């Protein structure tokens, strides 16, 4: 849960909204958790992604397995294997 708590703190610090944690452990072999948040603009979505990637790498020593959707940034997926972060623009979510 350390990774999840850390990502949630980053999302809150960077003004993401509608943060939702979905526990998928009993539902899907793909990931244990989906963490979903809303950004208010494309630059905001990209800044959230950048900050998560930078701080998790620096503070926890983890790199994402995959990042998808950075451009056009209407829906960015950051895959940390057990935790998958989804950052949506409000109109896409």
Residue ranges and their predicted role:
Residues 36-38:
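Short hydrophobic/aromatic beta-strand micro-patches
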Residues 1-30, 40-76, 90-93:
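Polybasic/polar functional segments that serve as interface/processing modules
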Residues 33:
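Phosphate-binding and adjacent anionic-ligand microenvironments
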Residues 78-80:
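Active-site beta-strand termini and strand-to-loop segments that position acidic
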